[in-house]
Amino acid sequence: MINIRKSHPLMKIVNNAFIDLPTPPNISSWWNFGSLLGICLVLQILTGLFLAMHYTSDTMTAFSSVTHICRDVNYGWIIRYMHANGASMFFICLYMHVGRGLYYGSYTFLETWNIGVILLFTVMATAFMGYVLPWGQMSFWGATVITNLLSAIPYIGTNLVEWIWGGFSVDKATLTRFFAFHFILPFIIAALALVHLLFLHETGSNNPTGISSDTDKIPFHPYYTIKDILGALLLILALMLLVLFAPDLLGDPDNYTPANPLNTPPHIKPEWYFLFAYAILRSIPNKLGGVLALILTILMPILMPLLHASKQRSMMFRPLSQCLFWILVADLLTLTWIGGQPVEHPYIIIGQLASIMYFLLILVLMPMAGSIENNLLKW
């Protein structure tokens, strides 16, 4: 009797990816975030689909259509807040997932890592366009400020911005195209995630030691399926606590005011998950310089494989690198805090120092620490 799980063309793919997949026996809870990201993506696509059924992408009716969803549609309020806070959970999982990759040296799987970086950019673009759709004050001014950064590009900048806007300012054309892109991109993300998984399964998972685990593997099911289910339950618990008790905790009160091109909010800022990059952008007094710093900030993960100087893959046995890694985490949290503060005395200098520290840590100190640790191994 041939097992259908191993013979059926479709079941075989599922089996090789989620059931009989040989997995390292020692991967910790830091390896849960991949499956959690998959759950977040499915949740966002489903809630987004139901929101799109009632949303209208027109400047005159967008704001009131979101209000209509919250007030008149059956369970519309919970769908809307699950979608908004689901994005926050998505980014928490994303940053944890990337942080895990940096700590344990997973970036040495080049194809998997590069597809992952592309995924990160695509999710960021999708989230930015989604934030514009409710057409509140912060939606409008956020879209204006961020798209306007492209005007810093020499020669073609202004034309490029007007092309993206579909006019001479953020208006109906901009909102319509952002809605179209926001709808299609999650499906592209889902396809990219499958490619990400495909490349990962070519090499197998990394593990906390950074040493090959080919001599000692266990099947994914039941060991890691049950572990992933626990992770999923905790994720859904956290999300629902946020949705049901503090749905507006991570949002901006300005977005409950309809978009008004004639009235600029006192502090324009993006959602919390972009604040670290926004802080670096603001800390440079020159427009083009700020834009370049912003691009460099989010390009850093791509450089990681090139900057790896250590003979060991993981940071598990590298105390100096561990120390620098946690300083980097603290630095990113500092930047996130600064990005949400007004541009005035103590915050400006803190932001500039934290920005310098970010680039210094990644480009200079961490590779140096790797080399020092290599020399210490010789003793």
UniProtKB/Swiss-Prot annotation:
Major location category of this protein: mitochondrion
Gene: MT-CYB
Naturally occurring in which organism (per UniProt): Tragelaphus imberbis (Lesser kudu)
BP-aspect Gene Ontology terms: mitochondrial electron transport, ubiquinol to cytochrome c
Residue ranges of the TM segments: 33-53, 77-98, 113-133, 178-198, 226-246, 288-308, 320-340, 347-367
Database matches in PROSITE patterns: CYTB_CTER, CYTB_NTER
CDD domains xref list: cytochrome_b_C, Cytochrome_b_N
Record-linked PANTHER family: CYTOCHROME B (PTHR19271:SF16)
Protein known as: Cytochrome b
Subunit record text: The cytochrome bc1 complex contains 11 subunits: 3 respiratory subunits (MT-CYB, CYC1 and UQCRFS1), 2 core proteins (UQCRC1 and UQCRC2) and 6 low-molecular weight proteins (UQCRH/QCR6, UQCRB/QCR7, UQCRQ/QCR8, UQCR10/QCR9, UQCR11/QCR10 and a cleavage product of UQCRFS1). This cytochrome bc1 complex then forms a dimer.
Highest classification ranks of the organism: Eukaryota, Metazoa, Chordata, Craniata, Vertebrata
